[in-house]
Amino acid sequence: MTEALISAALNGTQPELLAGGWAAGNASTKCSLTKTGFQFYYLPTVYILVFITGFLGNSVAIWMFVFHMRPWSGISVYMFNLALADFLYVLTLPALIFYYFNKTDWIFGDVMCKLQRFIFHVNLYGSILFLTCISVHRYTGVVHPLKSLGRLKKKNAVYVSSLVWALVVAVIAPILFYSGTGVRRNKTITCYDTTADEYLRSYFVYSMCTTVFMFCIPFIVILGCYGLIVKALIYKDLDNSPLRRKSIYLVIIVLTVFAVSYLPFHVMKTLNLRARLDFQTPQMCAFNDKVYATYQVTRGLASLNSCVDPILYFLAGDTFRRRLSRATRKSSRRSEPNVQSKSEEMTLNILTEYKQNGDTSL
């Protein structure tokens, strides 16, 4: 038993929770969480992958939108904001990578912990809402092309994007209260990805509200838009048109992101919180360990959207792909004399792409 207590102290597990995964305190009892080595290496490995690919992909995307995609269309505004949200998130990953390689001993202070969790949730729900905006924009362009001409302007997209940022920051602000650091019995510091036990019940209510209004409702809107888009593509004569191809890519990529990244995370986060609250009998301890381990897997999957979104810009945007190819060719031939002035070339490119794609181009 003494060896078990020493092992518990080294691993950050509460010693009184070791006996069969069950603890008997003065007034309450609860299951312990058996953390395996897999959990210490899985998340930092995923975060390293996301940081490298997400940093490069979103840097290129932001560079393209700022310097090579002018003038922007409405959908370009949404995609730029999506890339910006992803880029801000990947900048926070080095601290998390160090945290997990350091056996989850947080050394950066309480404020940085709160900011870390806040930015993660801002990226998570900001990405969901911007993907919803992109889907609604594409729906109106495909299903109601004439009625939507005035609604797809860049100015309206700027207003909607500003509203999205304000809404997300306001809704996620409570994370700054719920998250934070805590001291384990072995004196190491944890950075809560949810909250401490004392705030768990109110956090569960808050988490359910954000899940319903910031995930479930947007997901239903996206499914409705894509169902109507697919119906329109079937019945309209859009064979081999750029709009048809871009719409199909958009449907596939966004639904894949939701199925792989967002949906599993929200399901397992809710189940993990429920287990911490109510599944605290001796018979449920092994089940709770499995729920917690699976939840950690989905946390890694939830971060993958930051490196998958650049694929959306490339595959679902003919204009983005052409201008990226043109920009890379121009950078490799800077020493060659320009035959055409920059303004003439830009005018020609804009007229050509507008003729091919209209206002829904990207």
From Swiss-Prot:
Disulfide bonds: C31-C285, C113-C191
Membrane topology designation: Multi-pass membrane protein
Similarity section: Belongs to the G-protein coupled receptor 1 family.
Gene Ontology terms: cellular component: cilium; plasma membrane
Organism lineage: Eukaryota, Metazoa, Chordata, Craniata, Vertebrata
Binding-site residues for ADP, renumbered to this chain: K35, Y192, D193, T194, N272, L273, R274, A275, R276, Y292, A293, T294, Y295, R299
Gene that this sequence comes from: P2RY1
Function of the protein: Receptor for extracellular adenine nucleotides such as ADP. In platelets, binding to ADP leads to mobilization of intracellular calcium ions via activation of phospholipase C, a change in platelet shape, and ultimately platelet aggregation.
Organism: Meleagris gallopavo (Wild turkey)
Name of the protein this chain belongs to: P2Y purinoceptor 1
Extracellular side: 1-40, 99-114, 178-203, 274-292
Residues in the signal sequence: none
